[in-house]
Amino acid sequence: MSKIRGLPPAIRDPGPGVELGVVDGLLCQLIHSPEFNLFSDSVVFESTFIQVTKQGNWMDAYERSATMILGVTSSVPSLPLPNILLMANVTWPHGPFSTCSTLGAPVITLSRILPLKYVELQIYDRTQRILRVRTVTEKIYYLRLHEKHPQAVFQFWIRLVKILQKGLSITTKDPRIQFTHCLVPKMSNSSTETATESSLPASSQNSEAIMLLAAERNSSSLLELSNRHQTSRDRHTDTATETDNSGNCKSTPLVASSASMPMRAALTHSLWEQEDSNENFLQAPVASSLGENLLGP
């Protein structure tokens, strides 16, 4: 009886990304391997390219085709957009007895890991399916999509370039993850969660949260001083009333005003991302709102 070899331990239907060769490819396997163990929880979108140069007509940059794998991923899975660019070189070992039909497995060498904010991606030639990649060191690559990829893959890259240039109208909504560039921590108005925020490291709190926390402490101090002053004033008024029994004058004591809206209301939504314009949250910048809440009307 013949034996079937090479079956994986678990067989599952591959997704459309796997069939197109853009998900779970060689680059993804490399960075998720124990050797690197990078971005293990993030999906890698990758494609194979040929490095080319332009001398009248597009041609391979080297005598032997320079094959590269270009991919993007996210340093944190919850990010709405990728923020990491990956580049790897692909080579095939050529032994003295190797032929075109007996080539060994390709060798993948990770060459660059760059933040996408330091990289410029551009669709340079749509008909030839060529990308232009410029790094922060002014190194420019012209990469032609490998012929094994269908046209749909290049459409994915066109869409990716447009999204990276214009952005998306969404942000991550996970309150457990602190991103100073896209989130204001969502905290409730209960005093029990104030200690939780103060226990967070300073690097995870943004400037707005720190400013509001300091303002809240100052507001509590001012309110406590006002209450003490009012208590002593009431005691003094009661003593004067008992001493002077002949006078019938009525006096109205002054009451210290305090803002009814808690300072934590500003942290329920981002100052630049109001989900409902009818909600009674701070609409003015933090600097102008703090003065009203601290000093009262």
Swiss-Prot record:
The keyword Protein biosynthesis does not apply. Expressed in testis (at protein level). Residues 226-257 are annotated as: Disordered. The keyword Ion transport does not apply. Its main location: Golgi. It holds the Pfam family GARIL_Rab2_bd. InterPro entries: GARIL-like_Rab2B-bd (IPR022168). Keywords: Golgi apparatus. Disruption phenotype: Mutant male fertility is significantly impaired compared with that of the controls. Spermatozoa from mutant mice showed abnormal head shapes with an abnormal acrosome morphology. GO terms for cellular component: Golgi apparatus. One of its GO terms (biological process) is acrosome assembly. It is found in: Golgi apparatus. Residues 240-257 have a biased composition (Polar residues). RAB2B effector protein required for accurate acrosome formation and normal male fertility. Interacts (via N-terminus) with RAB2B (in GTP-bound form). Belongs to the GARIN family. This is Golgi-associated RAB2 interactor protein 1A. It comes from Mus musculus (Mouse).
